[in-house]
Every structure is written in structure tokens, then in C-alpha cells.
From Swiss-Prot:
Belongs to the OMP decarboxylase family. Type 2 subfamily. It catalyses: orotidine 5'-phosphate + H(+) = UMP + CO2. Its EC number is 4.1.1.23. This is Orotidine 5'-phosphate decarboxylase. GO terms for molecular function: orotidine-5'-phosphate decarboxylase activity. The active site is at residue 95. It comes from Bordetella petrii (strain ATCC BAA-461 / DSM 12804 / CCUG 43448). The lineage of its organism: Bacteria, Pseudomonadati, Pseudomonadota, Betaproteobacteria, Burkholderiales. Pathway: Pyrimidine metabolism; UMP biosynthesis via de novo pathway; UMP from orotate: step 2/2. Keywords: Decarboxylase, Lyase, Pyrimidine biosynthesis.
Amino acid sequence: MTFIQQLEHAWAAGNTLLQVGLDPDPQRFPRELEGKPDAIFQFCREIVDATAPYACSFKPQIAYFAAHRAEDQLEALCAHIRAAHPHLPIVLDAKRGDIGTTAEHYAREAYERYGAHAMTVNPYMGLDSVEPYLGWKDRGVIVLCRTSNPGGSDLQFLKLDNGEPLYLHVAGMVADKWNADGQCGLVVGATFPNELAAVRQRIGDAMPLLVPGIGAQGGDVTATVNAGRNAAGTGMMINSSRAILYASGGDDWRQAAADAARDLRDAINGVR
């Protein structure tokens, strides 16, 4: 089963477009995990198990693990997701942007070491920075397009000679040239619903969108769903991280995360 097929199955089986982001910050962990050498793994595992009924995918951010020398805990976490929740794809958020053999090794890291089903990549160096990942025909390649951060406008909103903004040119290039085998998706932030709608119109219904920016970054659920959904009412992985992970710092942190995920899933479904 390819990444896209797995994602489509998860949308349908769980009736959900919610993606749970895994950005573990040990300073915000519950007290019961203090001093444990594998606290990052334990925290993320419990979050995964609590929120899996409401998720269509999980997105671990690699820097949150690497900064604590916890890549082995990321390996263990990905193995746990594949074993306990095999229907839910793992999107490794790494935003890699190199070329050639370096990119090939990044692909091996994501797809072999961690067993991710997809990963985020940066297209700034052109096709050379994306092509090595496309060689893994059953995996997904999620290309940065219109990111949720305000500074993204410094480059992404620049106009080409034909008047088209750069982010929309990237969307069209991925859809028309790089997605021949149906592996690609795009990252488009919830904080820019007009641009999100423009991207969906440009690429059509087939390509999934990873949509960060809901929750702590201020993206609006109604505007996001209306702008980004496809004709089937799916087509998106709407990501939330901190609002779910740290819904409570008390003893009820597992249930609080589950409740936050369920509530956001229901809010999304109330629109689509």
C-alpha cells in the first residue's frame, strides 16, 4: 500500500482529517516522567495511543528528538506506531533540502531507519532536492509551498514575470511535473486561507495538503476546511501539536490530549 492509499484509508476509516504533531518538549512533560531516560518516547507513545482514534496520521518533528540525542527514541516511537496503529501513516517532519547523495541518505534515514511513510522536503534547490525521495515509490513526499510562518512571505509571495506568486508556481510545478506517480503533497498553512484556496484550485483534488497552523498559531478551522478540502470533503492533514500535547500538565494529561484531539476532529467534521 502506498502512502496516499494509506492516507485515504485513514481518512475514511476514522472519519477524520486531524494530524497529531509530535513535538516533545521535556520542560513541559508531566511530573511522572521526570528523570526517566526514555521520557520522550514514553510521552509520545502515550500521546499516540490516546489520540489514535481521532487521527489520520502522526507527524513527529525530528529536531525535537535530535536536540536531545533521542533519535533512538524516535526510532522506537515510529516502530510503536507501525505496530500498534498500522493504519495510520507517519509523516516525518524534517524539511530536508539538499541534493544528490546527501538527499539519498536523508531518504534512507526517513524511510529505512525510522520507517516513515512520508516526509517533508524543501524545494528551494529544485527537482534535484526532491527527486531522490521520489525513487521510493510507496512513500510520500510533502513539499513546502505556502508555509504558516509570517516570514514565509519574504520569498513565497514574490511575483514572477507572469504575475504568479512563487508559492503558486511551486504548487503547479509539483502537480504538473513532479507528481507523475502520485506521491506528492504540499505544505500550506492554515494561517493563509486565501492562499490555501488558491493552491487547492491550482492542483485539483488528487494531491493531499499538510496544513499546519491550527491552534497555537491562530489558524481558523472553518476557513481552513472550506479553503483546502477537495470535492470528497477530504484531501487534508490538518495538523495540531501543542494544543493537543500540552492540553494539561496534570495527572489527566493523557485524557486531556485525547479530548483535545476528539474536539478538534469534531470541529473539522462539523465544517466539511
